[in-house]
Curated annotation (Swiss-Prot):
Catalytic activity from the UniProt record: L-alanine = D-alanine
Organismal lineage: Bacteria, Pseudomonadati, Pseudomonadota, Gammaproteobacteria, Enterobacterales
GO CC terms: cytosol
Family of this protein: Belongs to the alanine racemase family.
Residues reported to bind substrate: R129, M302
Cysteine disulfide links: none
Keyword annotations from UniProtKB, A to Z: Isomerase, Pyridoxal phosphate
E.C. code: 5.1.1.1
Cofactor(s) needed by this chain: pyridoxal 5'-phosphate
Alphabetized InterPro entries for the sequence: Ala_racemase (IPR000821), Ala_racemase/Decarboxylase_C (IPR009006), Ala_racemase_C (IPR011079), Ala_racemase_N (IPR001608), Ala_racemase_pyridoxalP-BS (IPR020622), PLP-binding_barrel (IPR029066)
Active site residues of this protein: K34 (proton acceptor), Y254 (proton acceptor)
Protein name: Alanine racemase
Task of the protein: Catalyzes the interconversion of L-alanine and D-alanine. May also act on other amino acids.
Residues making up the signal peptide according to the UniProt record: none
């Protein structure tokens, strides 16, 4: 009997890519597969997304994994390179890089490369995390233009801080700032990530960068992926390893924090915080088993979770429960725990088996 297993539906993944293309029909798609494709498996996900135009990752090791796995499409390093030595690796492996600070610019000017590298200049239009400040952007761009180690044309990218249709002022200002800077400059432009792809068509430029939406997950609170025509890609399952009679007044788990008010049956699932399921999940967090929702009770342990199956339960050892997936949205589970969906899906550990279906 397998323990915790993440079932990844590649057909749903490809559906989501097609749906995203419908939201941005004039843009190329840069599939964001950082953090092990948000916990879904970096290389297999990239291989399944054959219709993506580009891929992007956060770290150079992720990019090299894609190249060694046979991915030949352009790959962008979203945080850029971290050291001078990285530049030769990028050049040899034809990996494109974001440039967002003067230290990277100086490194590009100093290094000797047999061929130039492709860069995306990141400008800070309001996120205030990475990017060249607007008042420094013209001079920065000109130095890139003059640098023989930089392939031309230079592409330009930014990131929106808060896609909120009810308060669009900040987003609109960021878009205006971006458009003012890129006016008349050649090369590809990119603003929109998942949220802006779905709700902000005025931000769609040459390239859009779907991340969380690719995996069927809403980037917005109080909504699920299906609200936007997206399908969940991951279903996290685990088997019942015990079904126990439980008397009224008995506790369960560490510190006995939960006390049964009535006689019931408790089930024990083979999953815990050692698998990446949050220890902070409170009593009442939902689990799906045998066509119904049941609550977690007591503390999440390293390897196990207890659930209240009810006094009339007929569940058996070996029955599989869904922690999130088709029957129970990840967004709903995240809201119970107080996590974002981004955190929850990317926290799974290597102990969770991954199974791919088409």
């Amino acid at each position: 009997m397998k323990g915790a297993t993440a079932i990844i539906n590649l057909k749903s993944l490809r559906h989501n890519l097609e749906k995203i293309q419908q939201y941005a029909p004039k843009s190329r798609l840069m599939a964001v597969v950082k953090a092990n494709a948000y916990g879904h498996g970096l290389l297999t996900v990239a291989q399944a997304l054959k219709n993506a135009d580009y891929f992007s990752v956060a770290r150079i090791e992720e990019a090299l994994t894609l190249r060694s796995g046979g991915i030949i499409k352009p790959i962008l390093l979203l945080e850029g390179f971290f050291s001078l030595e990285d530049l030769a690796v990028l050049q040899v492996n034809h990996i494109e890089t974001v440039i967002h600070n003067f230290e990277q610019l100086v490194a590009l000017e100093k290094v000797r490369l047999p061929e130039p590298v492709r860069v995306w200049m990141k400008i800070d239009t309001g996120m205030h995390r990475l990017g060249v400040r607007l008042e420094q952007a013209d001079a920065f761009y000109q130095r890139l233009q003059n640098c023989p180690n930089v392939a031309k044309p230079i592409h330009i990218i930014t990131h929106l801080s808060d896609v909120n249709p009810h308060h669009p002022v900040v987003t609109d200002q960021q878009i205006r700032s971006f458009d003012a800077f890129v006016q008349g400059k050649p090369g590809q432009k990119s603003i929109a990530a998942s949220g802006a792809i779905l709700l902000c068509p005025q931000s769609h430029r040459d390239v859009v960068r779907p991340g969380i939406a690719l995996y069927g997950i809403s980037p917005f609170e109080h909504f699920i992926g299906r609200d936007y025509g997206l399908l969940p890609v991951m279903t996290l399952q685990s088997p019942l390893i015990a079904v126990r009679e439980h008397k009224a007044g008995e506790t369960v788990g560490y510190a006995g924090e939960w006390i049964s008010q009535t006689a019931t049956f408790l089930g024990v699932l083979a999953i815990g915080y050692g698998d990446g399921y949050p220890q902070s999940a409170p009593t009442g967090t939902p689990v799906w088993i045998n066509d119904r929702q049941v609550p977690i009770v007591g503390r999440v342990s390293m390897d196990m979770i207890s659930v209240d199956l009810g006094r009339d339960a007929t569940d058996k050892v070996g029955d599989r429960a869904v922690l999130w997936g088709d029957q129970l949205s990840l967004e709903k589970v995240a809201s119970y725990i107080g996590y974002t969906a981004y955190e929850l899906v990317s926290k799974l550990t290597g102990r969770v088996a991954i199974s791919y279906v088409n």
